[in-house]
């Protein structure tokens, strides 16, 4: 889908946003050329972009308000990204209805990227095509098509803009990280670190990204986004059991999160990161309002929905958790870390004795990332409950090969996933018996 891609583009760009105050900018008047020095080629600012008015392919004046609304909302959403420089709506609309080359627009407005698209409505169906273009080279960096039932146009407009924004965040960061830089600054290293985190997680990738964020902080100790991303990474490394020094990582993550919030109290990323640190400290009840605040500040922050859903689950609100995971998956279906979201949906369904749905989600998670031990363990229980002992035993062996936590049921039962009495009762009726049938020892 088109919007997830676009959203991806801007998500990575988000790293740059934190160091560079976002603002709308109008084209600047050229300065008088000096006759005493050679003229240097103009280089557009990083993360500078114009959202061109989307084309109304049906040529129906009655639909112009919807088409223009998409353009205006995207302009507003992208401008919230710290570090972005978004051309103001009034300037962008001077290109409405005109066929102008993206490279020419880049020169005229001084931007690196052009987002363009079209909307066609037929009856109750709406098709939206969008693409991100490198204004310096004319290359297409990302494109996607979005087909939806018109239904509530206002809700559709919100959905579309959120998904595009999310996609653009990642794509812009990736694009910026690939540009050669003679003298990299803090922002360059932040973008490089963000680009690394768009790939499937591993100990090596965490280490690589951490090194880049550390370099950014060394260059600029006041870089809010560098502090925030490093804190998020340290907390995630602990949660994913990929930290050699978990206590030290958590203590430092806590300090960095506090630093980021002090420097930028209205930062969606900073609130999300504080939630991540609290989650890593097994303080889900305190993390929930931080995730909710992050979402209120940035409705496209898909990981915040997923983590909020997981905290709802861990605190006993099992039914309430599902819509948050569904929204996260809907906003960012190509998220690099989407496998745990699929897996936790499977966990919830298994605990609800919905084995077929559970296995479906767990297999989706496994196809995205085959190294998640909890996914294999829940698959073992699911297949055992379905009467497939051979597959159940195979999945249990996979889980045991990935984590020592699955060599006895007593060890599994110690997980903080089952601290809540409601969750433990559900597990005792479904998951634990399934593991027994799969062959896990009691002790």
Language-model-detected regions and their locations in the chain:
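Generic surface-pattern signal
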Residues: 169, 173, 198, 401-404, ...
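TPR/TPR-like (Sel1-like) alpha-helical repeat modules
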Residues: 384-407
């Amino acid at each position: 889908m088109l919007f997830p891609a676009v959203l991806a583009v801007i998500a990575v760009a988000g790293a740059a946003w934190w160091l560079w105050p976002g603002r709308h900018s109008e084209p600047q008047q050229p300065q008088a050329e000096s006759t005493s020095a050679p003229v240097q080629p103009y280089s557009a600012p990083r993360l500078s972009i114009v959202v061109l008015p989307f084309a109304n392919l049906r040529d129906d004046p009655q639909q112009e308000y919807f088409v223009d609304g998409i353009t205006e909302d995207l302009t507003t959403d992208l401008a919230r990204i710290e570090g972005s420089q978004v051309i103001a709506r009034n300037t962008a609309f001077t290109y409405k209805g005109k066929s102008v080359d993206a490279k020419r627009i880049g020169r005229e407005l001084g931007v690196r990227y052009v987002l363009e698209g079209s909307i066609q409505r037929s009856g109750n169906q709406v098709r939206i095509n969008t693409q991100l273009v490198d204004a310096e080279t004319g290359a297409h960096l990302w494109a996607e098509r979005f087909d939806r039932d018109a239904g509530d146009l206002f809700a559709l407009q919100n959905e579309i803009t959120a998904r595009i924004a999310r996609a653009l965040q990642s794509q812009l960061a990736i694009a910026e990280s690939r540009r050669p830089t003679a003298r990299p600054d803090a922002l360059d290293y932040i973008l490089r670190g963000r680009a690394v985190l768009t790939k499937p997680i591993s100990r090596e990738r965490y280490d690589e990204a951490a090194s880049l964020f550390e370099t950014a902080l060394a260059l600029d100790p006041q870089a809010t986004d560098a502090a925030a991303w490093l804190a998020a990474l340290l907390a995630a490394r602990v949660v994913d059991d990929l930290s050699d020094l978990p206590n030290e990582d958590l203590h430092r993550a806590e300090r960095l999160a506090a630093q980021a919030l002090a420097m930028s109290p209205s930062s969606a990323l900073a609130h999300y990161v504080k939630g991540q640190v609290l989650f890593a400290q097994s303080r889900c009840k305190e993390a929930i309002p931080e995730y909710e605040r992050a979402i209120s500040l940035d409705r496209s922050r898909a990981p915040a929905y997923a983590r909020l859903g997981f905290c709802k689950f861990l605190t006993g609100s099992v039914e309430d958790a599902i819509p948050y995971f569904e929204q996260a998956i809907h906003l960012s279906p190509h998220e690099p870390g989407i496998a745990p979201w699929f897996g936790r949906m499977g966990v919830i369904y298994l605990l609800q004795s919905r084995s077929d749905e559970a296995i479906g989600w767990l297999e989706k998670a496994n196809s995205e990332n085959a190294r998640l031990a909890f996914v294999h363990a829940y698959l073992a229980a699911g297949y055992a409950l379905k009467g497939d002992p051979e597959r159940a035993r195979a999945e249990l062996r996979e889980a045991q090969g990935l984590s020592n936590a699955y060599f006895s049921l007593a060890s599994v039962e110690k997980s903080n996933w089952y601290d809540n009495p409601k969750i433990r009762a559900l597990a005792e009726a479904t998951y634990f018996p399934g593991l027994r049938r799969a062959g896990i020892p009691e002790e």
